[in-house]
């Protein structure tokens, strides 16, 4: 009798046809990466993955956060002996401490002499006979006893939800515009959850923003590596660009012109590093630069797709996800970033593209962008 972790992967993977094996292979690699430093072995039995390890609680905590994992269950592995199956199912109900139960069987091993309905009926009757404190509830049981009969039998009563999604690094690359706020880390998480490899770019305005602000962004990236393993963070010096904009452009146009520079720089880095897209944490109408007109004007600088996974979400929903993934408490630390300094009193909310292009024509945009990219710092962030 052994305790193992059974891994059920996202149903989308089953829909990949001839590519399913590729997705499974990458998911298995990602699970192994998540378990770095933990002693474990993979066991495969008739279409199910199992993990054998010394510290299953630690294994559960790591594997449940791997994109592509739908569910994990700590199972008891036993021989295909019906008396043993009945006794182990009885024990599972007793250990649950619940008052109602139901038995569900998946008989993948068609050589087993009883079919699934017979197993459910006989095991349920055995539990009732040997435990007078419980009763059957087939519609809403407090304890669901799952029996999977394969080369061996696996019994479990507790399911732990995974994060679902697609296996990481199966769907291209994006450069996330990562600030120190609540939104952009959530956007990065949501892109990664769809299998997109995520790197980050942070615009640093020293000395107006402190090293603590930069450290905060590094900490946010590190939290994301809990889900993606590692992340490259590009830190771009942005002060010279901001000073030029402040000196030569109208105050009410500062924000949108700064956003256009950020977009241009992000696209240049993405091109240089072979990334197909840029991602942001923008949500329509949330701030002055995120009106429909503002997004159109900033998008004008993009030479590749710009993904905004939060575009239609309310702030409260974004905050809920931020708490769930563990970035919220870091995001609300009171360190200013380049987006919160030099904010005009009355920024334009309906910028006109032609006017903004004309306004920034007084700047040597190409030189400013190239200088910033040339001076950028590259930091590798890994899951500790």
Curated annotation (Swiss-Prot):
One of its GO terms (cellular component) is cytosol. GO terms for molecular function: ATP binding; CCA tRNA nucleotidyltransferase activity; tRNA binding; tRNA-uracil-4 sulfurtransferase activity. Pfam families: ThiI (PF02568), ThiI_fer (PF22025), THUMP (PF02926). CDD domains: PPase_ThiI, THUMP_ThiI. Keywords: ATP-binding, Cytoplasm, Nucleotide-binding, RNA-binding, Thiamine biosynthesis, Transferase, tRNA-binding. It catalyses: [ThiI sulfur-carrier protein]-S-sulfanyl-L-cysteine + a uridine in tRNA + 2 reduced [2Fe-2S]-[ferredoxin] + ATP + H(+) = [ThiI sulfur-carrier protein]-L-cysteine + a 4-thiouridine in tRNA + 2 oxidized [2Fe-2S]-[ferredoxin] + AMP + diphosphate; [ThiS sulfur-carrier protein]-C-terminal Gly-Gly-AMP + S-sulfanyl-L-cysteinyl-[cysteine desulfurase] + AH2 = [ThiS sulfur-carrier protein]-C-terminal-Gly-aminoethanethioate + L-cysteinyl-[cysteine desulfurase] + A + AMP + 2 H(+). Residues 57-160 form the THUMP domain. It comes from the Bacteria. It is found in: Cytoplasm. Belongs to the ThiI family. HAMAP family: ThiI. This is Probable tRNA sulfurtransferase. It comes from Clostridium acetobutylicum (strain ATCC 824 / DSM 792 / JCM 1419 / IAM 19013 / LMG 5710 / NBRC 13948 / NRRL B-527 / VKM B-1787 / 2291 / W). The lineage of its organism: Bacteria, Bacillati, Bacillota, Clostridia, Eubacteriales. The gene is thiI.
């Amino acid at each position: 009798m052994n305790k193992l972790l059974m891994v059920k992967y996202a149903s989308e993977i089953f829909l990949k046809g001839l590519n399913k094996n590729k997705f499974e292979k990458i998911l298995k690699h990602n699970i192994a990466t998540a378990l770095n430093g933990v002693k474990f072995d993979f066991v495969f039995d008739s279409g199910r993955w199992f993990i054998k390890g010394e510290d299953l609680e630690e294994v559960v905590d790591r594997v449940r956060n791997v994109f592509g994992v739908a569910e994990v269950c700590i199972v008891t592995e036993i021989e295909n002996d019906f008396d043993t199956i009945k006794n182990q199912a009885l024990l599972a109900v007793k250990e649950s401490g619940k008052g109602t139960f139901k038995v569900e069987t998946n008989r993948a091993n068609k050589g087993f002499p009883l079919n699934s309905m017979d197993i459910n009926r006989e095991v349920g009757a055995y539990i009732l006979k040997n435990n007078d404190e419980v009763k059957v509830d087939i519609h809403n049981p407090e304890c669901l006893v799952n029996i999977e009969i394969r080369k061996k039998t696996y019994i479990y009563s507790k399911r732990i939800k995974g994060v679902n999604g697609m296996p990481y690094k199966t769907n291209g690359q994006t450069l996330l515009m990562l600030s120190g706020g609540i939104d952009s880390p959530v956007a990065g998480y949501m892109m990664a959850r769809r299998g997109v490899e995520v790197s980050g770019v942070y615009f640093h305005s020293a000395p107006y923003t402190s090293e603590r602000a930069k450290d905060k962004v590094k900490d946010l990236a590190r939290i994301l590596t809990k889900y993606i393993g590692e992340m490259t963070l590009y830190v771009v010096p942005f002060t010279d660009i901001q000073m030029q904009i402040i000196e030569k452009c109208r105050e009410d146009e500062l924000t949108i012109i700064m956003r256009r520079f950020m977009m241009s720089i992000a696209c240049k880095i993405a091109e240089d590093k072979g990334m197909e897209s840029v991602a942001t944490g923008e949500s329509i109408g949330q701030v002055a630069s995120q009106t429909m007109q503002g997004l159109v004007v900033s998008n004008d600088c993009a030479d590749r797709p710009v993904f905004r996974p939060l575009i239609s979400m309310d702030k409260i929903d974004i905050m809920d996800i931020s708490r769930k993934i563990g970035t919220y408490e870091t995001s609300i630390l009171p360190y200013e970033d380049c987006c919160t300094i030099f904010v005009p009193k009355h920024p334009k909310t309906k910028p006109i593209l032609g006017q903004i292009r004309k306004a920034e024509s007084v700047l040597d945009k190409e030189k400013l962008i190239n200088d910033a990219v040339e001076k950028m710092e590259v930091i590798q962030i890994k899951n500790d």
